[in-house]
Swiss-Prot record:
One of its GO terms (cellular component) is extracellular region. It comes from Lychas mucronatus (Chinese swimming scorpion). It comes from the Eukaryota. Belongs to the non-disulfide-bridged peptide (NDBP) superfamily. Its main location: secreted. This is Venom protein 4.1.
Length: 60
């Protein structure tokens, strides 16, 4: 019985921590939606530019 209670307590603690993390992450995104979008676009641009740079290297 003690083991069952311990497992339930751990699961409850994990769910609370996960919920808090999710909410704090959502708040950050809502506070800075433009900066998040800029970061994502910059990452996407970097990914797009990598194959082009490789092709230029091969042409030279």
């Amino acid at each position: 019985m003690k083991a069952l209670c311990a497992i339930l307590l751990v699961l409850f603690a994990c769910s609370v921590m996960f919920e808090h993390f999710s909410i704090s992450t959502a708040e950050k995104v809502l506070q800075n939606p433009l900066s998040e979008l800029k970061r994502n676009c910059e990452k996407a641009d970097c990914r797009r530019s990598l194959p082009q740079n490789k092709q230029h290297d091969f042409k030279e």
